[in-house]
């Protein structure tokens, strides 16, 4: 039985990290694609030469033609311009929309049966555009956002409580931006909800509110520190977690930017929600109940995503 084929579209910092992680986890053979000649080939060769020490046999290939992604089981899209200090994810919309058109057409022509994970920002609008341009079924095109935002939330909580992050569960709803909704009520430490931990004196409501805000600002904090780009280790591990759930039919409950039609009162749009990922792609959207405050924050986030989608339609007439 042949190993799965994983196509990584974009050979920048995230793309290179994805390739290395996919190899170490032996998820399949990897094609690293980029329009810059030499970059994907050089990174693929470098990663392949780590195989003898790491102990993996995955085949690494660098490519500049979409023909090389033919038959891919998974495509992870990182192509596009990253954020610089002072930029919001939304500032990237005009530039990266053109990239999504090219990528979508490439996937449609050469890997129409793939499970596609989009990482390019502004995430919720770009994954919608990518699905439109590729024509793939909505359950097979998804955005990596919630896994990353939830990982940041979990990290901050584990530091605050001085417990293993393996015992912290948390997830984040809504768009991948300033309006994201870290759900305190549904987040726990070893099954104990965060509001109960406040009552137990483990932390204060003020500190919890600060952690929620720091989660919202998580990407911008790293952009500000790096000054020359944006995060790549945590985004890559988050996308690999999603790819592994699909390739191994793990039925993982993971928050991500998925097509929602009916759940949460929405009538067809991409936004961050809890989902189950298995061999069918997005197999289920988990329609959790929100209280009035959570619903208000979620509605605000949904409106922000709708604004981005409207902007895309204004830029690219074929999407209108």
UniProtKB/Swiss-Prot annotation:
Active-site residue numbers: 176
Which annotated residues bind NAD(+)? 10-15, 34, 96, 119-121
Q: Which NCBIfam families match?
A: MalateDH_bact, PRK06223.1
Q: What class of enzyme is it?
A: oxidoreductase
Write the gene name: mdh
Annotated EC: 1.1.1.37
What's the domain of life for this entry?
Bacteria
MF GO annotations: L-lactate dehydrogenase activity; L-malate dehydrogenase (NAD+) activity
Q: What does this protein do?
A: Catalyzes the reversible oxidation of malate to oxaloacetate.
**Quick one: which residues bind substrate?**
83, 89, 121, 152
Q: Which CDD domains match?
A: LDH-like_MDH
Which PANTHER family did the record assign?
A: L-2-HYDROXYCARBOXYLATE DEHYDROGENASE (NAD(P)(+)), L-LACTATE DEHYDROGENASE
Q: Which family does it belong to?
A: Belongs to the LDH/MDH superfamily. MDH type 3 family.
| Keyword annotations | NAD, Oxidoreductase, Tricarboxylic acid cycle
Name any Gene Ontology BP term: lactate metabolic process
What does it catalyze?
Answer: (S)-malate + NAD(+) = oxaloacetate + NADH + H(+)
What name goes with this protein?
Malate dehydrogenase
